[in-house]
Amino acid sequence: MTEQQARIVAFDDVPPNRRRGGDVRALLTPTTAGATSGFMGVAVVRPGERISEHYHPYSEEFVYVTAGAFEVDLDDVPHPLRTGQGLLIPKDVRHRFRNTGDVEARLVFHLGPLAPRPDLGHVDTEETDETAPAGVVS
């Protein structure tokens, strides 16, 4: 029997993170849910908005689009991604998401395994209006 408990976390329970563009909310994490092998969240991106380029040196990222349409750049190569499609982003692959439609777009993401420390899990490679200088690890 496991000591870990099931945990439900609502979208509105987590404050938005807008530092990289969009409204990104990490819902099920080590902090919010006691996760031990990865974390899951949701991103909401308005038309014309983007999530800035970054990569994950320790984790694969699994993405599923629940609404709208994106263009995702994978190491500078653009790929269309629409409602009902999933995407696997291998570790160390630079990626950014742009909402190419005229309605709000939403995606669910999961990253695993976890980095040794949270500050090592995400490397920014470009600035947005709300980010620190490029190359800052967060």
From Swiss-Prot:
Residue ranges of the region described as Disordered: 118-138
SUPFAM superfamilies documented for this protein: RmlC-like cupins
Gene3D superfamilies: Jelly Rolls
Protein name in the entry: Protein SchB
Source organism superkingdom: Bacteria
Cupin type-2 domain: residues covered: 42-108
Family classification: Belongs to the SchB/CurC family.
Record InterPro entries: Cupin_2 (IPR013096), PKS_Associated_Protein (IPR052044), Polyketide_Synth_CurC_prd (IPR016672), RmlC-like_jellyroll (IPR014710), RmlC_Cupin_sf (IPR011051)
Lineage: Bacteria, Bacillati, Actinomycetota, Actinomycetes, Kitasatosporales
Residues forming coiled coils: none
Name of the coding gene: schB
